[in-house]
Amino acid sequence: MRLNTLSPAAGSKHAPKRVGRGMGSGLGKTAGRGHKGQKSRSGGGVRPGFEGGQMPLKIRLPKFGFTSRRAMVTAEVRVLELAKVNGDVIDLNALKDANVITRNIQFAKIVLSGTIERPVTVKGLKVTKGARAAIEAAGGKIEE
């Protein structure tokens, strides 16, 4: 048996309906689209969300919220990703050099996820309580 010889069991698959192939099929001539009208035409139909000219629900409801500009330049760094950084001192530039965060990031916060084995010194980064405990348990320290 080879992959190119595999086929479904006989009778387990239905052939697709072939529309517009003669009156005897029951789907000839208009091919199940009825007579005239927008939906019978090629490319016919309305876009999703169109309500026939009535003011759509999306526009009837008010706008809400905003996108924080600071969130676009802030990153969360997991504790286990600190292992990718060469050297003992970890700051924003060290994270960028190790490709842990992208170049446009201006703020980073270290969060507890995974473990760290070696002692490191974290400088100028925000650190959660859990991440702080994990770093200090490994013999590292945090400098503000």
Curated annotation (Swiss-Prot):
Signal peptide: none annotated. PANTHER family: 50S RIBOSOMAL PROTEIN L15 (PTHR12934), LARGE RIBOSOMAL SUBUNIT PROTEIN UL15M (PTHR12934:SF11). Keywords: Ribonucleoprotein, Ribosomal protein, RNA-binding, rRNA-binding. Belongs to the universal ribosomal protein uL15 family. InterPro entries: Ribosomal_uL15 (IPR030878), Ribosomal_uL15/eL18 (IPR021131), Ribosomal_uL15/eL18_sf (IPR036227), Ribosomal_uL15_bac-type (IPR005749), Ribosomal_uL15_CS (IPR001196). Transmembrane segments: none annotated. Residues 1-54 are annotated as: Disordered. It comes from Shewanella baltica (strain OS155 / ATCC BAA-1091). This is Large ribosomal subunit protein uL15. Part of the 50S ribosomal subunit. The lineage of its organism: Bacteria, Pseudomonadati, Pseudomonadota, Gammaproteobacteria, Alteromonadales.
